């Protein structure tokens, strides 16, 4: 039998076996400190959940393609003397697509973060 097929069959079996052992042998004793938010071992005096500006998440999501660009271009840089003009054309096309995407992000103000965006603290969640 092929080694790959053995791994495909064996890995889920081992994973489920370890999960079953954990479920059967684990001790479940919840208490307030375990169920609460971690505050460096100190009891918090107010609500720990604050509103988070979604623009920061958007910047992180938009950062991913440009971060992956570096790992995609690294093999080309290492083999620049071995690839022909065809490889160079493919890399230029790849960079052109990324540049078009970046210009689109700038034109749609996707990277603009509103400085005056404050969370609504009038909600009952934020009161003691």
Curated annotation (Swiss-Prot):
Root EC class: translocase
Cell compartment(s), UniProt: Mitochondrion membrane
Membrane topology, record value: Multi-pass membrane protein
Function: Core subunit of the mitochondrial membrane respiratory chain NADH dehydrogenase (Complex I) that is believed to belong to the minimal assembly required for catalysis. Complex I functions in the transfer of electrons from NADH to the respiratory chain. The immediate electron acceptor for the enzyme is believed to be ubiquinone.
Stated family: Belongs to the complex I subunit 3 family.
Oligomer and partners: Complex I is composed of 37 different subunits.
Protein name (database record): NADH-ubiquinone oxidoreductase chain 3
Species the sequence originates in: Yarrowia lipolytica (strain CLIB 122 / E 150)
Designated gene of the protein: ND3
């Amino acid at each position: 039998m092929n080694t790959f097929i053995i791994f495909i069959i064996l890995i889920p079996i081992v994973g489920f076996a370890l999960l079953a052992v954990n479920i059967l042998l684990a001790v479940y004793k919840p208490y307030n400190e375990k169920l609460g938010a971690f505050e460096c071992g100190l009891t918090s005096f107010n609500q720990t959940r604050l509103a988070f500006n979604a623009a920061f998440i958007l910047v992180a999501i938009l950062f991913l393609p440009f971060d992956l660009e570096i790992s995609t271009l690294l093999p080309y840089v290492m083999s620049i003397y071995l690839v022909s003009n065809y490889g160079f054309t493919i890399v230029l096309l790849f960079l052109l697509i990324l540049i078009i995407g970046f210009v689109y992000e700038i034109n749609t103000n996707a990277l603009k973060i509103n400085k005056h965006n404050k969370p609504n603290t009038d909600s009952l969640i934020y009161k003691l």
